[in-house]
Amino acid sequence: PEDVNVFSMQTGNPTVPAYLADASFYYDDRTKTFYAFGTNDGAGGENVYPAQMWYSKDCKEWKNKVIAFPKSWTDYAGTLCVWAPSIEYNPDTKKYYLMYSIASNTFVGMADDLLGPWEDANGAAPGKMLFKGYDGQFFMDDDRTMYIVTDSWHFKIMKLKFDEAGKIYIDNSDPVFAKSDSNPFIGTYHYTQIEEIKNAFEASFIFKRNNLYYLMWS
């Protein structure tokens, strides 16, 4: 890309010539391809836009592609601090979902292919942010219920639901998610909060193994 010199000046990245902090690495069984998305900042703090993703069949030869965000995202949030993407595939909707925070405004997109094109996936407020926060990560449970874990210090977990077109909504019907917040676009939404974790800061991530749930953070 035109700005690859900014990426490669001081990173010493052995895999791709990119500064790929907060990397979201995804292997897709459907395409037999590895994909890498990451925070969009230069090694010295420079902003590098538009965001890019990298993909490879063998983790040796990599290609990159610019991610074209819906224009309404950057019209509202700008192009600085494009952080911490997350990728998930929902077999029920047959859509890929991409989540990015831009200046602590979190947006979700969807596509039929990880190479795009990406369209806005916010069902409650099309083209707008889903919630205020950053470092949001998807988690899909064994029953295909999807969640988002996000924020810093006290991590929030939100439950998701989808309409027939594959658009995302925050599911407010589960009484377990008893706390509430709001924003001017989607109104009130519910979540549960993970509190009192010693030294918890940001970048929360959930995975499941042998029927146990694990929460990671920085």
Segments predicted by a language model, with ranges:
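Carbohydrate-active catalytic/glycan-binding domains of CAZyme proteins
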Residues: 1-218
